[in-house]
Regions:
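Intrinsically disordered, low-complexity segments enriched in glycine/proline and serine/threonine
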Residues: 7-8, 212
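Nucleotide and nucleotide-moiety/phosphate-recognizing core
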Residues: 8-145, 151-158, 166-185, 202-207
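An accessory alpha-helical subdomain
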Residues: 160-162, 188-189
Length: 212
């Protein structure tokens, strides 16, 4: 699927966070490289993002773990947290706006991401909100203007993504909007446990069957 380029929007970059520990998957497991349907998770995620960003991709994680990828940057703060990863990726990006996702989200819906891009306008952050107000910071679009607020919080050891919201112009994508493009909310499915991997395999098998 090729998404038409928005002539008014400068090129976006996708930032994939791959620096988190995978302890819940078992000792020594790098979940970014887990095999799902014959491909490793991070490559599946990249394939979902490329129709939107082409080769404008940044992986945030230990560079020595991902030598085969073009641009890999480490976390810029020693404290491991999603906010640190997001900040590190934004700092390395030349794009005004950036799609940020986790490396373990194999069912990202391109149409939903495209809708989010269309809602950037003059916002600093576009983020899904569903259920009882649950936010998905690792399937969101961040503008470079977020950097100043993030850095101010990080140097104060404030690692909550929500803590940056009061200082930014935020567009929440509500559940009703999300379900127009992703009725099952599969874009937000991520893999933390072995059971999640089993479920992901079943989802992938089901999709293969339905496409026959």
């Amino acid at each position: 699927m090729i998404v038409e380029e928005n002539k008014e929007m400068p090129p976006l970059t996708a930032i994939i966070l791959a620096g988190g520990r995978s302890n819940r998957m078992g000792a020594g497991k790098d979940k970014a490289k887990l095999n799902l349907g014959g491909k490793c998770l991070i490559d599946i995620v990249i394939s979902r993002l490329q129709p939107l960003v082409g080769d404008n991709l940044i992986i945030v994680g230990p560079p020595e773990k991902y030598p085969a990828y073009k641009q890999v940057v480490p976390d810029l703060f020693s404290k491991g947290s999603p906010l640190v990863g997001i900040y590190s990726g934004l700092k390395a990006s030349f794009s005004l706006y950036n799609i940020v996702v986790g490396c373990d989200m194999p069912f990202l819906e391109v149409k939903l991401l495209q809708y989010m891009i269309e809602n950037i306008n003059s916002n600093d952050l576009v983020i899904p909100r569903y259920g009882a107000g649950y936010l998905e910071p690792l399937c969101a679009i961040y503008g470079k203007r977020c950097l100043e607020v993030m850095e101010r919080n990080l140097v104060k050891d404030i690692f909550s993504v929500r803590a940056i919201f009061p200082y930014l112009k935020v567009r929440f994508i509500e559940e009703e909007e999300i379900k127009k493009y992703d009725p099952g909310l599969y874009s937000f499915f991520n893999i933390n446990y072995k059971q999640d991997m089993i479920r992901a395999e079943k989802i992938m098998d089901s999709r293969r069957e339905s496409s026959k």
